Design a protein with these regions (language model features):
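Polybasic, low-complexity RNA-engagement segments
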Residues: 1-15, 19-50, 280-432
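A short acidic, Gly/Pro-enriched loop at the edge of an enzyme's catalytic core
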Residues: 102-105, 167-178
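Conserved class I S-adenosyl-L-methionine
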Residues: 104-113
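Conserved SAM-binding loop of SAM-dependent methyltransferases across substrates and taxa
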Residues: 114-127
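Helix-to-beta-strand junctions that scaffold the AdoMet/dcAdoMet cofactor pocket
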Residues: 125-126, 222-224
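S-adenosyl-L-methionine
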Residues: 134-172
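Mobile active-site "lid"/loop adjacent to the S-adenosyl-L-methionine
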Residues: 139, 176-217, 229, 233-240
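Class I S-adenosyl-L-methionine
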Residues: 172-174, 209, 227-230, 234-327, ...
Length: 432
């Protein structure tokens, strides 16, 4: 069995008492792995009919499945690159369902990287409402951006700031907030030996201090009647019950709806803590909608691209940042005082006398919204050639073409003289 920190074992024994030995025995078992379906791109029925992997339903989420990584590698399947599913630890999938997201909700993911909760929220919103996906760590935010881009949504703003600045911008604004708080990571011990090496009790207390600050700021951003879900992937009482109980005691309008621990000896998962809080007190909201400059001549090259290569006309909610053109969410809040990575959907880059579509746009559009689609079957080696950055011989000269796998757009190519030049981003190209 793996060697676990002595102080950690002492504390868990106090919490679990008679179940302690059963908990320890769970470390002799393999880690659990899961994937979660993006229902904006493929229905559960169609996904299951493909019969790609030996999947088992995860009981606490309709879109989640267990898989055995010794038998299959979903991360090396083109459907993963297409954003059809997201690889996520199974017990972590228990968090977002507690939010009870409704279409049109305004939602905040305060500690979002690498994107597990945010991608789940986007699929629940189904291209309605708004998600503000925040990550304070500037290194981790790049992975967040890539994962959200792959899921294909226009209603998401990605910010890179701390909870205090968020609170000052969004007081009383959100219907739902999730805080997957930075923690000591005790629930990662079985799958990541580095987490064991990094663990100290002082880290537990350091995380607790940060968690208390984040939940206070998060609560201020909820509107009356709103729901806040707090979660960690750790087992310490200090970072879980103690944080929640102190917060509830300090806030008369905060009501604890439920709290739950998922232990690895009780469920098939690595472990999680989840608490659901409702806000009953009023909060004065002064968030203003972003004022957009009407763009006409500035986007003529985009409109020309749209006319030639798309079957839709996107509404005129455009924003220019340098040469980058964005389609911003409806009723987009003013976020000018925050560091913003993405203002909604990045459409592409306006260059001299032409428009170059973004990778994000290919993931957002449905195949019927694109004039020219080169569909490739999942079992055709050509799709791997495309993902590696190779050209594809098509025999046509249609200009901008969306490459799709099983009817799901996965990226762009530009076709001339019978050859499709590859525009799949170099940083995303596969090595296998």
């Amino acid at each position: 069995m793996i060697s676990l920190p002595e102080k950690f074992l002492e504390d868990v024994k106090v919490i679990l008492q008679d179940e302690y030995e059963e908990f320890i025995d769970s470390y002799n078992e393999n880690k659990t792995t899961g994937l979660r379906l993006n229902t904006m791109k493929m229905s559960k029925e169609k996904f299951q009919k493909l019969n790609l992997f030996d999947l088992e339903q995860i009981p606490w989420t309709n879109e989640g499945f267990y898989y055995d990584e010794s038998v299959c590698k979903p991360g090396k399947n083109p459907l993963h690159e297409a954003g059809v599913y997201y690889l996520q630890e199974p017990s972590a999938m228990s968090v977002v369902p507690k939010l009870d997201i409704q279409k049109g909700d305004r939602v905040l993911d305060m500690c979002a990287a690498p994107g597990g909760k945010s991608t789940y929220i986007l699929s629940q919103l189904d291209d309605t409402g708004l998600l503000v996906s925040n990550e304070i760590n500037p290194i981790r935010i790049n992975a967040l951006g890539e994962n959200l881009e792959r899921f294909g949504a226009r209603n998401c703003i990605i910010t890179n700031t701390d909870s205090t600045r968020l609170r000052k911008t969004f007081t009383g604004y959100f219907d739902k907030i999730v805080i997957d708080a930075p923690c000591s990571g005790e629930g990662m011990f079985r799958k990541d030996p580095v987490a064991i090496q990094d663990w100290t009790y002082s880290k537990v207390l350091e995380c607790q201090s940060i968690q208390k600050e984040i939940i206070r700021d998060g609560y201020k951003m909820l509107k009356k009647g709103g729901i806040l879900v707090y979660s960690t992937c750790t087992f310490s009482r200090e970072e879980n019950e103690d944080v929640i109980e102190e917060f509830i005691a300090e806030n008369e309008g905060a009501v604890l709806i439920e709290k739950e621990r998922l232990w690895p000896h009780k469920i098939k998962g690595e472990g999680h803590f989840v608490a659901k809080i409702q806000k009953l007190d009023d909060e004065d909201c002064r968030v203003k909608e972003m004022k957009l400059k009407k763009l006409n001549n500035e986007i003529k090259e985009y409109r020309s691209f749209e006319k030639k290569f798309l079957n839709i006309n996107l509404d005129n909610r455009f924003m220019l940042r340098g040469d980058n053109l964005y389609l911003v969410p409806d009723e987009c809040p003013n976020v000018e005082k925050l560091k913003v990575l993405r203002y909604g959907l990045h459409l592409g880059v306006l260059k001299k006398n032409r428009f170059e579509p973004s990778h994000a746009l290919s993931h957002y559009l449905k195949p019927e919204q694109i004039k020219y689609v080169q569909n490739i079957e999942l079992n055709d080696e050509t799709i791997f050639d495309y993902l590696r950055g190779n050209v594809i011989n098509t025999g046509e000269s249609r200009g901008w073409v969306a490459v799709a796998v099983e009817g799901i757009p996965i990226g762009w190519g530009k076709e001339s003289n019978g050859v499709l030049k590859n525009h799949y981003p170099k940083g995303l190209r596969i090595k296998y």
